[in-house]
């Protein structure tokens, strides 16, 4: 098995997390997984959705989008079509669920955090890059809210990261790029905490069904890659 990028089966793409990437948001990063590049911002607003009012806790929600020419051919903006596509809705819900798992919302006060993940260049793994980058932006945003005195304590329970794994040419591989993803027999997206817990596992067989042993091999690869991602997040936050 030869990967198009020349990487080993258990090798992540080169990853970079650049903090404070935009001026106005409470937290922002540019996250790069190889040629996939996503701007993640976290905006804080006072108040919560109606279903949470008066309960003394906060909320976090997420939106996801792709620039029209983030892909090989231009895609029409969803705004010009008048509605979001099913893929977009699925991904932004995944991002929101994943980031909420990192927080104790009761310590957020009655504040809402808006996660915005905008893909400026896509080469596979945009949802996993978004979650990994948005976690760092979230931690920066919480630091800003702490300075403002808006928090009841430290809402952060754990770090969160995500990575893709799959079966490519019969072999489990880590962190698929677009060429691999489009030809993979199986594609799996894994979201985990730095304590080793799973938040979400999304898996689909594109060719032949995958066997339990292959699923276990992919999950082991994901766990291995996740440790590297948490180290990269911590290194970015230490800068």
UniProtKB/Swiss-Prot annotation:
The keyword Chloroplast is assigned to this record: no
Keyword line: Nucleotidyltransferase, RNA-binding, rRNA processing, Transferase, tRNA processing, tRNA-binding
Enzymatic reactions: tRNA(n+1) + phosphate = tRNA(n) + a ribonucleoside 5'-diphosphate
InterPro entries associated with the record: ExoRNase_PH_dom1, ExoRNase_PH_dom2, ExoRNase_PH_dom2_sf, PNPase/RNase_PH_dom_sf, Ribosomal_Su5_D2-typ_SF, RNase_PH, RNase_PH_bac-type, RNase_PH_CS
E.C. numbers: 2.7.7.56
Gene3D superfamilies documented for this protein: GHMP Kinase, N-terminal domain
GO MF annotation terms: 3'-5'-RNA exonuclease activity; RNA binding; tRNA binding; tRNA nucleotidyltransferase activity
PROSITE patterns per record: RIBONUCLEASE_PH
GO BP term (any one): tRNA processing
Pfam family membership, one: RNase_PH_C
Residues annotated as binding phosphate: 87, 125-127
Similarity-based family: Belongs to the RNase PH family.
Entries under HAMAP family matching the protein: RNase_PH
NCBIfam families, alphabetized: RNasePH
PANTHER family for the chain: EXOSOME COMPLEX COMPONENT (PTHR11953), EXOSOME COMPLEX COMPONENT RRP41 (PTHR11953:SF0)
Role according to the record: Phosphorolytic 3'-5' exoribonuclease that plays an important role in tRNA 3'-end maturation. Removes nucleotide residues following the 3'-CCA terminus of tRNAs; can also add nucleotides to the ends of RNA molecules by using nucleoside diphosphates as substrates, but this may not be physiologically important. Probably plays a role in initiation of 16S rRNA degradation (leading to ribosome degradation) during starvation.
Oligomeric form and interacting partners: Homohexameric ring arranged as a trimer of dimers; dimeric protein does not seem to be catalytically active.
Protein name per UniProt: Ribonuclease PH
